[in-house]
Amino acid sequence: MKMDLTGKRALIAGGSRGIGLAIADAYAQAGADVSICARTEGPLREAEVALKKHGHKVLATPCDLGDANAIKQWVEASAKSLGGIDILVNNASGFGRTDDEAGWAVSVQIDLMATVRACHAAMPYLEARGGSILHISSISGLGASVRTPPYGAIKAALIEYTQTQALSYAGKKIRVNCIAPGSIFFEGGTWDIAKRDKPELYERILAGIPSGRFGIPEEIATVATFLASDLASWVTGQTIAVDGGPNL
């Protein structure tokens, strides 16, 4: 069986690096036209060049995902350019690194409300012919975590939101699922920085992964491609942990 997305139109919020870029790349390889957005122009342009090598349509748009109007404009412009929307991936995160007003505010706005707003903006297009919504949460949302409270709490909210949406939209032929990644290593990412600046934390987290290594973005992208494809046509409301087994 082949995970085929030929003819699909996919939007990936937070798609210029790491997990988001890996998902966009996997979707393009599977035949989809893709639209990505992120805050920073430089990585977006690099991602655009890489994605276009697969021969499908690629849009790369700077977007402040804390701005409700900017999200709506990105979704609507993407739908117009691609001819519709079949897949929406919400991957952006503010990371909520501090347990204070600022940390909670960024997690609520970027991890949660940007997701809600993108879903609202995309819904008319998804309802037109059915489709798939995918939220990227975290294993920090599945239980107690070394992360700060805002990050884990809002990632947990995404898991509940997935279930509620799946129940609400099943009759409209829209599937909603969630991936909870574990510790994912990529250049310039959280664990790349920790390896250099906080080696004790890096080694402690690594020691807690039964698989003996950090994951890579492509391992999340493989599951994301399955969930977006027709092979997962009867899968909805699920959160899949892709984590190497630390919670076993």
Task: Mark where each language-model region is.
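Alpha-helical segment proximal to the catalytic Tyr-Lys
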Residues: 124, 167-168, 233
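Residue(s) in the substrate-gating loop at a strand-loop-helix junction
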Residues: 138
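Active-site helix of classical SDR
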Residues: 119, 154, 162
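A glycine/serine/threonine-rich, flexible loop-to-helix segment
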Residues: 1, 49, 53, 171, ...
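Conserved glycine-rich cofactor-binding loop
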Residues: 16-17
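Short C-terminal tail/terminal secondary-structure segment
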Residues: 1-6, 143, 224-225, 236-248
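Short, small/polar-rich loop/turn modules that mediate ligand/substrate recognition or access, typified
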Residues: 170, 175, 235-237
